[in-house]
Amino acid sequence: MILDTDYITENGKPVIRVFKKENGEFKIEYDRTFEPYFYALLKDDSAIEDVKKVTAKRHGTVVKVKRAEKVQKKFLGRPIEVWKLYFNHPQDVPAIRDRIRAHPAVVDIYEYDIPFAKRYLIDKGLIPMEGDEELTMLAFDIETLYHEGEEFGTGPILMISYADGSEARVITWKKIDLPYVDVVSTEKEMIKRFLRVVREKDPDVLITYNGDNFDFAYLKKRCEELGIKFTLGRDGSEPKIQRMGDRFAVEVKGRIHFDLYPVIRRTINLPTYTLEAVYEAVFGKPKEKVYAEEIAQAWESGEGLERVARYSMEDAKVTYELGREFFPMEAQLSRLIGQSLWDVSRSSTGNLVEWFLLRKAYKRNELAPNKPDERELARRRGGYAGGYVKEPERGLWDNIVYLDFRSLYPSIIITHNVSPDTLNREGCKEYDVAPEVGHKFCKDFPGFIPSLLGDLLEERQKIKRKMKATVDPLEKKLLDYRQRAIKILANSFYGYYGYAKARWYCKECAESVTAWGREYIEMVIRELEEKFGFKVLYADTDGLHATIPGADAETVKKKAKEFLKYINPKLPGLLELEYEGFYVRGFFVTKKKYAVIDEEGKITTRGLEIVRRDWSEIAKETQARVLEAILKHGDVEEAVRIVKEVTEKLSKYEVPPEKLVIHEQITRDLRDYKATGPHVAVAKRLAARGVKIRPGTVISYIVLKGSGRIGDRAIPADEFDPTKHRYDAEYYIENQVLPAVERILKAFGYRKEDLRYQKTKQVGLGAWLKVKGKK
């Protein structure tokens, strides 16, 4: 199994290293024969000797073309002859490429920016993560001492925790009497002990949570400060910290550094990405949070260190559990894309598509288009019409079916052969013309991207059939990871067409796909309403919610299934409408904002949730009660009564203070805040009193009654004393409770002022309150 590749230099020549695990053993294979190259298109082939004379300097050495050969390629499906220019060293390529491009005989150069080790994987057809090797994993985490205003890495590391499949332990340098804590004499000894643990356990995978941007950089800084050689690589090297966009990325040679943070950001949509929030979202179990100031206080006072050690150990355990959960999917993506898991786990979906296409292009002898320069990038900036949205029908509705297209955009790309190489191509016998935008796509041959996408969808269907047939739970799970990886990739192709930095960028393709998408969903709505008596309540891009006013549940379900049998034969190619679900009741507010309840009583909301930290418990609780009243009981008036009751209790100071606490996270150094929100104001006052505040600290506060700015009236939650303080009832009504329910009840004709007990009485809203869709 290939874990990763890189190259080193021996006697001025590049040597590819392939890090592998075979038969349970780690090994490094070397290849000294692979040469760096790129392609050049010439106006006149006779100029090649002149081009070979172009030189550049790199570190005082003259760089030039080592040799050249003429090759037959295809560019966007059309035959083309180009020159393949070879060089002595990968670093020669960036040194000389602009000079060769500037030569009068050169039309353009291609594939000059593909990193050497990645090029090797592509050209040799090697697939990382392929095979059945059992990889060993170790997760680790650090706790540090931080004071406001200190430079990063100044404070000591207090604890290093680690976990694998057999144990979870903490190393520290203060006396803590717990069975899983190893106590050493100094910070230096602690770091050296941890490095020894890694060498002895020799894991194939190191798992961190934001290790790219924190743990490794902090360890490196402390190692430099304390004179420790920070060797973690299997070749004896130190971790390599490099910039990747606006973040950092850390490589450990011979081991896969699996940072969960970018993976989870790409995979799960959460209001906050603390380790605690992620763990609860994934496993449904809470994890205690010990804040930075609590760690500092415990360390400096010596009291409560057991709690900090337990927290540190749990950090490592939780990171290990999350790593085991997410690693198999990333391994499948790595196999599918054909690049290392280290790269794939840090890639956007657009980059995943691009690396997949680069590998397939090489296999099909296609020359990859160049990435855009700044001028071209500016030209590409600009939008196009998206998916169709039908504005929602207001009110409360019963017996709702949800129908949607299976893989709408991938199906359109394949069905209509939407691809840069088929776009407006002259001399074709047959074209598909996109509605509204009028772009033509040749149907005489399968386009590069549609054919690849077709293969992917076909493979996914085969895997799903295998999943149904197998009785082995492990095989079923692995197949599921594979089909999900394919789904992620396949669903990213449409977005890739419109991605301005893409090599195979094609705005005409992207806007044609959405134009066909609009045509098909509008046609489905028309047929559903006119021929089957449905009322479409809301539609968005590839799916719709609909009911038959006055019909019971069984009738609605039966008619929906009859409609699918009627409509699917009318849809071209791979397009297929599916029955996705049935809901007992629901309401639709605006675009992408609705709530429905299924037959098991499960409420699903979209765009209405308030799960961010900066909502108090009273706001969350009120919204949940309002949704339950409307969806479970079908009673909008009850929902309004709940809101009035809560606002009344707030006004009369009858709500317990624990329900009023607002939590907000400090995301940067306090001195970097321009605007001072309530949490920042509280944090600054705490810092002035000696409390340690750093990025990541969560401030919990309550807003008091009074005049002046909110920030001046916010106090730490644990300082609130009901005998001395009064909360600001008006603030909680206007900024917490009403915003949490206002957009829901607005769908039934209520205004904000209708929801307060002390304001105007309820006016005639019978038309809104009547449950629609009933007999």
Curated annotation (Swiss-Prot):
Listed Gene3D superfamilies: DNA polymerase family B, C-terminal domain, DNA Polymerase, chain B, domain 1, Helix hairpin bin, Palm domain of DNA polymerase, Ribonuclease H-like superfamily/Ribonuclease H
Pfam families in UniProt: DNA_pol_B, DNA_pol_B_exo1
Keyword Oxidoreductase recorded: no
Keywords for the protein's UniProt record, in alphabetical order: DNA replication, DNA-binding, DNA-directed DNA polymerase, Nucleotidyltransferase, Transferase
Entry-linked InterPro entries: DNA-dir_DNA_pol_B, DNA-dir_DNA_pol_B_CS, DNA-dir_DNA_pol_B_exonuc, DNA-dir_DNA_pol_B_multi_dom, DNA/RNA_pol_sf, DNA_pol_B_thumb, DNA_pol_palm_dom_sf, DNA_pol_type-B
Catalyzed chemical reaction(s): DNA(n) + a 2'-deoxyribonucleoside 5'-triphosphate = DNA(n+1) + diphosphate
GO biological process, one term: DNA-templated DNA replication
EC number, UniProt record: 2.7.7.7
PROSITE patterns hit by this protein: DNA_POLYMERASE_B (PS00116)
One function term, GO molecular function aspect: nucleotide binding
Family: Belongs to the DNA polymerase type-B family.
Protein name stated in the entry: DNA polymerase
Organismal lineage: Archaea, Methanobacteriati, Methanobacteriota, Thermococci, Thermococcales
